[in-house]
């Protein structure tokens, strides 16, 4: 009997994310010498129904320390998992879910559980001498995702007046992932010059995800800026736009309306605004266009914005129960997958499979609080997701994912870049 995959040691510690906030890092060792480690990300605009990120609420780090989550790994989870076969991912995840005993992972913390879940998968892959994408996806993992690069930041990710959170470029006309990265990087530098010319050199400061955060006041102004950057780079035919409205962040529950540019706007009016934008600019995808609880509104938006990818992030929070409801209603047509929203690798894969089985596209995503950890790059390829959203081609915690994908494409030799087939990449 091969015991080389047996978990030999699990250890967690508190480290920092890209915003200087504490997060959980976990390391897993197997008896066969396999090693895996993961640093858990953290979001700024979070869905109400996300799994619980356990914070200490003490004076340290302004209440954001995660020492309790770290202790939960070292003192509780580790004791239960030592000796388990690291290849039994679903069993290991279920053991942790049983230990926690809550629907939202509020006892042990999703940050504790996820750190171990991903580190176990990495340790198993290392023991098997396989790259993570191949360990999870097998020989069928061959699709390189089209990157959605967030080059203009607003909302919770920046300090400007923009209501929408992310203005992204997606190089669907590239022939490979490496070429896609080049196109985006060149456009990013082109946009930097446009921003400097229009707003001054002091305006080329960047937001949490590496995109520029100039003093833009309107959504139309931001889109026009983006278009000029793409034109100057020479990629009008290759690059399209995607948006993350993060509409829950500017929704006023008391009045049931959205505050856009300082004015109250109804759901119908906001959908009309999206229609106007889609008609004027090369927008192919809109994430969280409406309030996270408005399944009916999402259904209408999906019907009205024909041909546009409507992505559910805060709407679904990578949760199969919420995704099932959306599928049954026809709310949205795409799932944004964030592993820390749900808290285990198994549940993340379940959500991806449910999306694909029901004709929903898939976007694997980072969080605004990231690290040098590049796990989601491997996951995007393992799932043949077709799309990945992990920030601008700037800041080390963002480029770490892009660089890993460049390596994976090189290693695969025969792969398919999703490109224009980003919705149905296989």
Swiss-Prot record:
The keyword Cytoplasm applies. Keywords: Cytoplasm, Glycolysis, Lyase, Magnesium, Metal-binding, Secreted. InterPro entries: Enolase, Enolase-like_C_sf, Enolase-like_N, Enolase_C, Enolase_CS, Enolase_N. The keyword Metal-binding applies. The active site is at 209 (proton donor), 338 (proton acceptor). Pathway: Carbohydrate degradation; glycolysis; pyruvate from D-glyceraldehyde 3-phosphate: step 4/5. Its main location: cytoplasm. (2R)-2-phosphoglycerate binds at residues 165, 338, 367-368, 389. It is an enzyme of class 4 (lyase). Binds a second Mg(2+) ion via substrate during catalysis. Its EC number is 4.2.1.11. It is found in: Cytoplasm; Secreted; Cell surface. Mg(2+) binds at residues 244, 287, 313. It catalyses: (2R)-2-phosphoglycerate = phosphoenolpyruvate + H2O. CDD domains: enolase. HAMAP family: Enolase. Belongs to the enolase family. Catalyzes the reversible conversion of 2-phosphoglycerate (2-PG) into phosphoenolpyruvate (PEP). It is essential for the degradation of carbohydrates via glycolysis. This is Enolase.
